[in-house]
């Protein structure tokens, strides 16, 4: 798969400057950016299959924390977001375990996608080694 067949560029023209500005404005306003149907159906189906195949290589982690990943603050009310615990369960597969021809690796290494993320986040992005 090529980057152009992985990303739904009809709905998410990440190389369009106006679209990028719109995404940044939504992120700045809401604190989150939801990009529904960002991946094409074909690439999403394949990535789900691939993740099931790689599951045995994943490192799994369970954590209880607040949204800030900080210790609770006794000076704030109990119902303050800083003092509300949530649970995270995740499984991570290291970069070197992801097949070279994986759509995930293709997207991760695509310079135009990285440029879009850097513009929206207003920050540099560096790949893991």
Regions found by a protein language model. Give the residues of each.
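Signature of the catalytic double-stranded beta-helix
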Residues: 39, 46-58, 76-129
């Amino acid at each position: 798969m090529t980057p152009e067949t992985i990303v739904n560029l009809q709905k998410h023209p990440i190389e369009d400057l106006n679209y990028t500005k719109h995404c940044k404005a939504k992120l700045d306003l809401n604190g989150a950016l939801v990009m529904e149907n960002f991946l094409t159906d074909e690439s999403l189906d394949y990535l789900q299959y691939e993740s099931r195949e790689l599951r045995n290589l994943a490192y799994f982690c369970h954590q209880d924390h607040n949204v800030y990943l900080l210790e609770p603050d006794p000076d704030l009310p109990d119902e303050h977001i800083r003092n509300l615990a949530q649970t995270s369960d995740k499984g991570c597969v290291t970069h070197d375990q992801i097949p070279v021809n994986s759509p995930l690796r293709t997207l991760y290494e695509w310079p135009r996608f990285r440029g879009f993320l850097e513009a929206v986040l207003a920050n540099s992005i560096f790949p893991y080694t």
